[in-house]
Amino acid sequence: MCGRYVSPEQASIERAWKIDRTSSNPFPRRFNVQPTTDVPVLRLDGRALVLEAARWGLIPHWWKQDKPPSFTINARLEEAADKPMWREPLRGSRCLLPAEGWYEWQALAGGKQPHYIRRSDGRPACFAGLMSIWRDRPSCAILTRAAAGPVAQVHDRMPVVLADAAHAGWLDPALKDATRYAREHALADEFTHYPVSKRVNDARNEGPDLVEPLRP
């Protein structure tokens, strides 16, 4: 799964993608993004690439209860086409979540050790995402897959990080088989990771020191 990540500031997002329109206040750089908070997402509106805020934790448009559903921050790629929660967004409401990297917790004999995972080339690790609008509020989920490459040393799941050339295709409303597309265009071996401070465990902690390598 992916339960915490690092979100780039808006200026970095605008340098990496040709944004046509923004519909939110400027996004700051965040080093400890947690579920249910608003995060930057990229989506298509017609032909325009829009940067906007969405709640991390998808709420389907048909949700009847006042309390949002639990456990909707991640959608398993291998199940998304069949599950009612994900099926409709996968078909017609896909998005991208810009990220610098993410955290995973490695199970060790003495407890869980957080690791920071990022692309080896330093480029943004853009997550494939799903969106929905509930009571006029956008929300989103990150697609995940079985871990591969170096990430498998830390955890058994990882976000679907799309290759740069696949971003436009993922957002294209004409895409027919999104599951296959994500599987074929997901990065696997292009990552590095290292242990970081357990300060990241507390969602109240924030700052660049969270991604500093843990000193022996």
PLM regions: where:
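Short linear sequence motif anchored by a di-proline
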Residues: 1-216
